[in-house]
Regions:
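Extracellular domains of the immunoglobulin superfamily
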Residues: 1-122
Length: 122
């Protein structure tokens, strides 16, 4: 079946770097863009941006342009989110989500990972 499997929870100190993986299976990886979504505790979902899985070109939302990097290992059907110089406000659950369906001028994310929780604590 189609699924996105994310790496496990992370505990990091402020200033460190974290890299989260999202492994796709059950479909052709390069046919669908991959989005990243942040959910801080008690907050709603925030779209961070996406990476074109065919060209490798990333697009970042305005608030996620500085310390965040999307990358791919296409041969392993895996997308990555790296966060550098971690801050307290980065403590959240991060989801990968496949860009799947375009309807009525809106893109819908049709397959989601289970999420990776990042805890930032000194």
């Amino acid at each position: 079946q189609i699924q996105l499997v994310q790496s496990g929870p992370e505990l990091k100190k402020p200033g460190e770097t974290v890299k989260i993986s999202c492994k796709a299976s059950g479909y052709t990886f390069t046919n669908y863009g991959m989005n990243w979504v942040k959910q801080a505790p008690g907050k709603g979902l925030r779209w961070m941006g996406l990476i074109n899985t065919y060209t490798g070109e990333p697009t970042y939302a305005d608030d996620f342009k500085d310390r965040f990097a999307f990358s791919l290992e296409t041969s392993a059907s895996t997308a990555f989110l790296q966060i550098n110089n971690l801050k307290d406000e980065d403590m959240a659950t991060y989801f990968c989500a496949r860009k799947g369906i375009y309807y009525d001028y809106v893109w819908f994310f049709d397959v989601w990972g289970a999420g990776t929780t990042v805890t930032v604590s000194s």
